Amino acid sequence: MSASALSSIRFPGSISEYLQVASVLSLLLLLFKTAQLYLHRQWLLSSTQQFPSPPSHWLFGHKILKDQDLQDILTRIKNFPSACPQWLWGSKVRIQVYDPDYMKLILGRSDPKANGSYRFLAPWIGRGLLMLDGQTWFQHRRMLTPAFHYDILKPYTEIMADSVRVMLDKWEQIVGQDSTLEIFRHITLMTLDTIMKCAFSHEGSVQLDRKYKSYIQAVEDLNDLVFSRVRNIFHQNDIIYRVSSNGCKANSACKLAHDHTDQVIKSRRIQLQDEEELEKLKKKRRLDFLDILLFARMENGKSLSDKDLRAEVDTFMFEGHDTTASGISWIFYALATNPEHQQRCRKEIQSLLGDGTSITWNDLDKMPYTTMCIKEALRIYPPVPSVSRELSSPVTFPDGRSLPKGIHVMLSFYGLHHNPTVWPNPEVFDPSRFAPGSSRHSHSFLPFSGGARNCIGKQFAMNELKVAVALTLLRFELLPDPTRVPIPIPRIVLKSKNGIHLHLKKLQ
């Protein structure tokens, strides 16, 4: 066919006509989405009208800097009783709750986790116990509960003590008389060391092996990245987030975290191929966390898939060390800033343990004042600042106000613990609040959440807190650094914007 013949052929429509049609369709789609968002916002405004809040911008919501959330909640508590809406942007709102009666009602229901917040955790920890809902959650919870039976927890006390002593030995070598130490990273390595040995049958010391620092850094990065993504309207879209700089960082951090947990699972599977190891396992009355997962059979008779197995390991690896590290770090800071209570704890521990060469399961219930101080520190600095739920059905609160199905409710444990109508003078460190016989609302103190979905490892965590505090106070006096006062910020766990710096004075 000649060139002249080709040039005479006419195609239906020109490129400009196609562009015009595409522009009209795009405009119609934009108008449709705008109307959809407007109607959704009107529904949200109507649904939350019983709950006053500070003025907000129609598009940008309440203009809150990401590191000022905690200060903002304290202001809201004074002005808006029980609960208050927080608008993140035009059609995104959550009801912040900080009242014990509200907490009791919500935690007593079976509402799922708020998908808008928790789905950003899925690329990291998968759909393990933290993320599951309904019958699947119930099956996994029932399967894992035996890992926290007291027969399992008893021998962990000495393992915890060994890990703490390794950390304290390091501190003796690196602290000077006038120097301060940023303690959070050291404590994080120690709690990872503990969870690896107790729950995952790890041999060796995480604290003395530099390769584990990359996992610690990955967890720290993911804490920040997940929190940042929740607050960014553009990063709600998975495609946009993947190509963003934060999305690339999150992908790299997830890979590091997954490589770590994959290696833990692989190592244990190799160990279990050894007949001697299997014989030792058969003699145990109860299995450890990872062994339960490896030998588990679900109700359909099948073992856990590799995906489900890693999700549970990723979840407990993170929750079992990072939340505990936050708790211990803030407890140490609270004791450093309240020396009279620190000294009273030390005397109690010295009378119980002597020089601390040995600490047993039975000792943990014989330090009442130290336990009171630990609880008071957890009140002021709850390791998990909040959790979120999406209402699966309408709810009416004790004061008569109500919310419809579909609303996101953020249970602010930090707000609850700092609510002056619940805790008079909430900023004052007063361990007597937890004295034996003292009365309080059943849902006024929730460092491990509450209801059926409370922290499955809360007894494990409390034991580790007691061991760490007891052995540390026998070796060091904790003193604050007045030039670097920590600034609490909410991430998945409670962190400090500028670290937690203490003077450590070696005791004679």
Curated annotation (Swiss-Prot):
<dbReference type="GO" id="GO:0097267">
    <property type="term" value="P:omega-hydroxylase P450 pathway"/>
</dbReference>
<keyword id="KW-0256">Endoplasmic reticulum</keyword>
<dbReference type="InterPro" id="IPR017972">
    <property type="entry name" value="Cyt_P450_CS"/>
</dbReference>
<comment type="similarity">
    <text>Belongs to the cytochrome P450 family.</text>
</comment>
<dbReference type="InterPro" id="IPR050196">
    <property type="entry name" value="Cytochrome_P450_Monoox"/>
</dbReference>
<dbReference type="GO" id="GO:0020037">
    <property type="term" value="F:heme binding"/>
</dbReference>
<feature type="binding site" description="axial binding residue">
    <location>
        <position position="455"/>
    </location>
    <ligand>
        <name>heme</name>
    </ligand>
</feature>
<dbReference type="InterPro" id="IPR036396">
    <property type="entry name" value="Cyt_P450_sf"/>
</dbReference>
<dbReference type="GO" id="GO:0005789">
    <property type="term" value="C:endoplasmic reticulum membrane"/>
</dbReference>
<keyword id="KW-0503">Monooxygenase</keyword>
<dbReference type="InterPro" id="IPR002401">
    <property type="entry name" value="Cyt_P450_E_grp-I"/>
</dbReference>
<dbReference type="Pfam" id="PF00067">
    <property type="entry name" value="p450"/>
</dbReference>
<dbReference type="GO" id="GO:0005506">
    <property type="term" value="F:iron ion binding"/>
</dbReference>
<keyword id="KW-0560">Oxidoreductase</keyword>
<comment type="function">
    <text>A cytochrome P450 monooxygenase involved in the metabolism of fatty acids and their oxygenated derivatives (oxylipins). Mechanistically, uses molecular oxygen inserting one oxygen atom into a substrate, and reducing the second into a water molecule, with two electrons provided by NADPH via cytochrome P450 reductase (CPR; NADPH-ferrihemoprotein reductase). Catalyzes predominantly the oxidation of the terminal carbon (omega-oxidation) of saturated and unsaturated fatty acids. May act as a major omega-hydroxylase for dodecanoic (lauric) acid in kidney.</text>
</comment>
<dbReference type="InterPro" id="IPR001128">
    <property type="entry name" value="Cyt_P450"/>
</dbReference>
<dbReference type="GO" id="GO:0004497">
    <property type="term" value="F:monooxygenase activity"/>
</dbReference>
<keyword id="KW-0408">Iron</keyword>
<dbReference type="GO" id="GO:0018685">
    <property type="term" value="F:alkane 1-monooxygenase activity"/>
</dbReference>
<keyword id="KW-0479">Metal-binding</keyword>
<dbReference type="GO" id="GO:0052869">
    <property type="term" value="F:arachidonate omega-hydroxylase activity"/>
</dbReference>
<keyword id="KW-0492">Microsome</keyword>
<keyword id="KW-0472">Membrane</keyword>
<keyword id="KW-0732">Signal</keyword>
<feature type="binding site" description="covalent">
    <location>
        <position position="319"/>
    </location>
    <ligand>
        <name>heme</name>
    </ligand>
</feature>
<dbReference type="GO" id="GO:0006631">
    <property type="term" value="P:fatty acid metabolic process"/>
</dbReference>
<feature type="signal peptide">
    <location>
        <begin position="1"/>
        <end position="37"/>
    </location>
</feature>
<protein>
    <recommendedName>
        <fullName>Cytochrome P450 4A12A</fullName>
        <ecNumber>1.14.14.1</ecNumber>
    </recommendedName>
</protein>
<comment type="pathway">
    <text>Lipid metabolism; fatty acid metabolism.</text>
</comment>
<keyword id="KW-0349">Heme</keyword>
